[in-house]
């Protein structure tokens, strides 16, 4: 597993505003989208490209274009939806799939899958999983293995913040027969008794969309 923790003044500034409990949902959504666009630069560093002959107004040349089959962006519902615009802004030609998962509150590292909208065959596709929080790591491991069971061999996970416990769980449990990377804006102190990241930013889904009882 490759872990990339981004270090940039813009990311640090935006992440601080994002964490502030007084930041309204509208601003929170904008910041999530902006942070993901900044993360996308590093996350797509290994994006596969092919030669593309073109003509400029001055002369012919051979440039590059994203290879086919197109990469697929997979937000983990519901909080991952808040990251989607930031990714599609950078890769408008990418396909989008959806994966619905929620934490089993009695067993925090176990997940319940309640929805999916993905191609049956992901062989040869570069997959980008997006989920704001890497807390226990259970969601990320389950989601990645779900993609691998459909043939994926190249998965990049993009999260905003992570806990050391979650990173360790992913390292120990992700299957080895895959190219797997994790890109995050920051790694926090750890998890509290409820498996929330500390200091964290609260429940990302609630702050994006409001609490649903």
From Swiss-Prot:
GO MF assignments: GTP binding; magnesium ion binding; uracil phosphoribosyltransferase activity
EC number: 2.4.2.9
TM stretches of this protein: none
Organism: Bifidobacterium animalis subsp. lactis (strain AD011)
Cofactor binding note of this UniProt entry: Binds 1 Mg(2+) ion per subunit. The magnesium is bound as Mg-PRPP.
Organism phylogeny: Bacteria, Bacillati, Actinomycetota, Actinomycetes, Bifidobacteriales
Protein name: Uracil phosphoribosyltransferase
Residue numbers binding 5-phospho-alpha-D-ribose 1-diphosphate: 78, 103, 131-139, 203
InterPro entries found in the cross-reference section: PRibTrfase_dom, PRTase-like, Upp_B, UPRTase/APRTase, Ura_phspho_trans
Regulation: Allosterically activated by GTP.
């Amino acid at each position: 597993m490759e872990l990339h923790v981004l270090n940039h003044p813009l990311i640090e500034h935006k992440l601080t505003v994002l964490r502030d409990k007084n930041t309204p949902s509208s601003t929170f959504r904008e910041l999530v989208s902006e942070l993901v666009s900044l993360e996308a630069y590093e996350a797509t560093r290994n994006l596969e490209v092919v030669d593309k002959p073109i003509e400029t107004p001055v002369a012919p040349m051979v440039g590059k274009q994203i290879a086919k089959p197109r990469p697929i962006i997979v937000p983990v519902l519901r909080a991952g939806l808040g990251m989607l615009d930031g990714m599609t802004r950078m890769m408008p030609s990418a396909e989008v799939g959806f994966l619905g998962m929620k934490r089993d509150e009695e067993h925090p590292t176990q997940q319940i899958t309640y929805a999916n909208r993905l191609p049956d065959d992901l062989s040869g596709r570069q997959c980008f999983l997006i989920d704001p929080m890497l807390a226990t790591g259970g969601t990320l491991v389950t989601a990645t293995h779900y993609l691998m069971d459909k043939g994926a061999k190249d998965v990049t996970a993009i999260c905003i913040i992570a806990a050391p416990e979650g990173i360790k769980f992913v390292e120990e449990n992700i299957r080895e027969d895959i190219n797997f990377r994790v890109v995050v804006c920051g790694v926090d102190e750890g998890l509290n008794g409820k498996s929330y990241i500390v200091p964290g930013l609260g429940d990302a889904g609630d702050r994006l969309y409001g609490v649903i009882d």
